[in-house]
């Protein structure tokens, strides 16, 4: 292919600005905002979007997947157990059986977030990176959206006002920090919300409590993944991720039920 490439600077800049403006105009009022593009957040996004729910995922870093990429201590594999393996199979992720452990599978720690993120995007979810949620919209004792800022502006310590995204529901899938529910508790002490944080590692207990702890913790605000265990003082579990995927799916199902009943 020897054809001349077109590279006009003005056209490039105009294209970026117009497409970005159009995107933001479409995203300032959505059904669900998911804060944190880790395993549970991406899973929730996939199931919500494929059911026609207008979903945007906000991630402070420039990549999605949370801690999945690093596997276990940098070794490039994660473990997932039945029945969560079906969630990964739906996304076309290859799983290897663990000899002597019929309930366990290993998966490539790069393939998993890559394909799960693509599955969420293909389902219709929008993932925005480099965006941090610094506060919540709180109206009449209900979370009604998020207050957002550029992560680079926050890191630079610049005093620049944020903008907002309105939503029917917000999901805190920010992992161990549970930053969304912690922000709600810190800024609105009259609500009496306490976030005890997660306990030390007990994989079996941690995994089995994740779906149970996945729920609406304040009107309009759900927790899933490690944020759910942090809110309920559950145990951590290490590089086994089945509970995370099941938690994300359950969170999506809970919101779908709410939307259907409205």
From Swiss-Prot:
Name recorded for this polypeptide: Thiamine thiazole synthase
Gene Ontology MF term list: iron ion binding; pentosyltransferase activity
Residues binding NAD(+), per UniProt: 40, 59-60, 67, 133, 159-161, 179, 226
Function: Involved in the biosynthesis of the thiazole moiety of thiamine. Catalyzes the conversion of NAD and glycine to adenosine diphosphate 5-(2-hydroxyethyl)-4-methylthiazole-2-carboxylate (ADT), an adenylated thiazole intermediate, using free sulfide as a source of sulfur.
Transmembrane segments: none
Signal peptide: none
Reactions this protein catalyses: hydrogen sulfide + glycine + NAD(+) = ADP-5-ethyl-4-methylthiazole-2-carboxylate + nicotinamide + 3 H2O + H(+)
Binding, Fe cation: 161, 176
Keyword Isomerase among UniProt keywords: no
Co-factor requirement: Fe(2+)
SUPFAM superfamilies: FAD/NAD(P)-binding domain
Similarity comment: family membership: Belongs to the THI4 family.
Entry keywords, A to Z: Iron, Metal-binding, NAD, Thiamine biosynthesis, Transferase
Primary gene name: thi4
Gene Ontology annotations of biological process type: thiamine biosynthetic process; thiamine diphosphate biosynthetic process; thiazole biosynthetic process
Assembly behavior: Homooctamer; tetramer of dimers.
Binding site for glycine: 236
Annotated pathway: Cofactor biosynthesis; thiamine diphosphate biosynthesis
EC number: 2.4.2.59
HAMAP family: Thi4
């Amino acid at each position: 292919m020897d054809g001349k490439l077109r590279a006009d600077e003005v056209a490039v800049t105009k294209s970026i600005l117009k497409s970005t403006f159009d995107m933001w105009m479409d995203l300032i009022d959505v059904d669900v905002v998911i804060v944190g593009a880790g395993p549970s957040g991406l899973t929730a996004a996939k199931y919500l979007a494929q059911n026609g729910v207008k979903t945007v995922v906000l991630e402070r870093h420039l990549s999605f997947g949370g801690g999945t990429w690093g596997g276990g201590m940098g070794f490039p594999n994660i473990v997932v157990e039945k029945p969560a393996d079906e969630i990964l199979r739906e996304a076309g992720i290859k799983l290897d059986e663990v000899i002597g452990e019929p309930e366990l599978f290993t998966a490539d720690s790069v393939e998993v977030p890559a394909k799960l993120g693509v599955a969420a995007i293909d389902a219709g979810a929008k993932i925005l990176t480099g965006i941090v949620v610094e506060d919540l919209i709180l109206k009449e004792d209900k979370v009604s959206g998020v207050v957002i800022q550029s992560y680079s502006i926050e890191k630079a310590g610049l005093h620049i006002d944020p903008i907002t995204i309105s939503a029917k529901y917000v999901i805190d899938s920010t992992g161990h920090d549970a930053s969304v529910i912690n922000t709600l508790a810190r800024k609105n002490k009259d609500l009496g919300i306490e976030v005890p944080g997660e306990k030390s590692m007990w994989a079996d207990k941690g995994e089995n409590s994740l779906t149970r702890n996945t729920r609406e913790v304040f009107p309009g605000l759900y927790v899933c993944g490690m944020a759910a265990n942090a809110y309920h003082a559950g145990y951590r579990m290490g590089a086994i991720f089945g509970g995370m995927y099941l938690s994300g799916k359950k969170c999506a199902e809970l919101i779908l039920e709410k939307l259907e009943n409205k």
